[in-house]
């Protein structure tokens, strides 16, 4: 029991630490939520509550499915995203998770559905309008906000007084292997005015371009 709790904590911490790296944050969160869902499913089955187990399984599938679509959304917003832009502004999005770990899945679905609705509507409008309606901090709240709120939970109470179902040791080994993997920092594009000028001025012979003074250039 303590082994799985420790791994969930590590996964949430890793997602939080890499909130500026879309893929790493998404991957760590997906694994952590899968482990938590697996625990809840097995507990429901042990208590002979198949309907509850099915409900948890469906909710878990929807959330991880949504997480896989995150790169598509961030492609549209990439030019306007800063890693720490809204890290302190997500409280309103994740307030429900302060009451219960179970609510985290509901909050994730709620946030995603709102973002998806905005995305679908704005695809028919100008890109600039989309930037105003669906700001980047909404995405930041979706992933890093939830993982941060979850990390604050006392995970021990999550499994307290319950016979913990054993999760496949192979899967736990894979999780540990992922946790040990180093995350390479993302390459940041830097603006090079000189290179941009040379590209713009390519094809002109020096002195023949009347729009740019060769001496100044």
Which residues make up each language-model segment?
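Long alpha-helical, hydrophobic tracts
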Residues: 1-58
């Amino acid at each position: 029991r303590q082994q799985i709790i420790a791994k969930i904590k590590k996964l949430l911490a890793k997602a939080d630490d890499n909130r500026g790296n879309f893929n790493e944050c998404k991957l760590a969160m997906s694994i952590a939520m899968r482990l938590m869902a697996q625990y809840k499913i097995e507990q429901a089955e042990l208590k002979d509550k198949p309907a509850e187990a099915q409900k948890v399984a469906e909710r878990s599938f929807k959330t991880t499915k949504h997480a896989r679509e995150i790169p598509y959304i961030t492609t549209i917003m990439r030019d306007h995203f800063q890693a720490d832009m809204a890290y302190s502004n997500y409280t309103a999005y994740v307030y429900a998770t302060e009451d219960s770990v179970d609510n985290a899945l509901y909050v994730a679905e709620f946030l995603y559905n709102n973002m998806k609705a905005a995305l679908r509507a704005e695809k028919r409008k100008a890109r600039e309008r989309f930037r105003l309606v669906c700001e980047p901090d909404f995405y930041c709240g979706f992933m890093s906000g939830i993982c941060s709120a979850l990390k604050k939970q006392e995970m021990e109470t999550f499994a307290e007084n319950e016979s913990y179902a054993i999760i496949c040791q192979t899967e736990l080994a894979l999780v540990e292997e992922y946790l040990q993997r180093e995350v390479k920092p993302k390459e940041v594009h830097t603006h090079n005015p000189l290179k941009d000028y040379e590209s713009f001025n390519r094809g002109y012979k020096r002195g023949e371009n009347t729009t740019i003074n060769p001496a100044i250039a």
